[in-house]
């Protein structure tokens, strides 16, 4: 479990750095627009939109920018029609990788994703080739200075499937359908949540060598830098040495 949460923290910090450069804003606006188009502009009844808005606020996006993206989504007529796509493949060392995209041009997107895999020792697979190795779940991360017994009791009572304390962090895993119930229960109890999101979580992590990790990180970075890519997931278990070097 520690491998999951540490990697999530690294991705979170990288996301904040990217946001300062303006790189991530395009992806966030795209996700907000699509979420509003699919489920309406009311955050209280649209979990996907609520999560997208939270990510945008965490990246210091202005509320006016967020509201405009929601309006475009609800209006539906303006802008390109974005389609959600998922690509599956293998990275260096046979690591399973999922790539979630939003794009208005499938041919462009698959070409760019395939190129990234090929350039860094991986290969694009077929639908279903690795997705069975992942489960869609909610992940909530909290600082360990929160009252652990209280956190555990509230989370489990609200429907969490697992709660663990690793290093300086409490990690809570939920089924998708219980994610917002658990999150709201924690927040209603005035407990501080550091990060929360729906994710594709590897059922089993695969240990990889540091050499393989370096190649894999280059692949993941290249995929995440593509405009059409929203999220990248893998089942790699990185060594403490690699995780520390990325902090």
Swiss-Prot record:
Gene Ontology process terms (BP): regulation of DNA-templated transcription
InterPro entries: Integrase-like_N (IPR017856), TACO1_YebC-like_2nd/3rd_dom (IPR048300), TACO1_YebC_N (IPR049083), Transcrip_reg_TACO1-like (IPR002876), Transcrip_reg_TACO1-like_dom3 (IPR026564), YebC-like (IPR029072)
Gene3D superfamilies in the cross-refs: 1.10.10.200, 3.30.70.980
GO terms assigned for molecular function: DNA binding
Pfam families (UniProt xref): TACO1_YebC_N, Transcrip_reg
Primary localisation category: cytoplasm
Subcellular location: Cytoplasm
Cysteine pairs bridged by disulfides in the record: none
Keywords, sorted A to Z: Cytoplasm, DNA-binding, Transcription, Transcription regulation
GO cellular component: cytosol
Highest taxon above the source species: Bacteria
Keyword Secreted: no
Coiled-coil segments on the chain, per record: none
UniProt record similarity statement: Belongs to the TACO1 family.
HAMAP family assigned: Transcrip_reg_TACO1
Record protein name field: Probable transcriptional regulatory protein lpl1249
Organism for this UniProt entry: Legionella pneumophila (strain Lens)
Phylogenetic placement of the source organism: Bacteria, Pseudomonadati, Pseudomonadota, Gammaproteobacteria, Legionellales
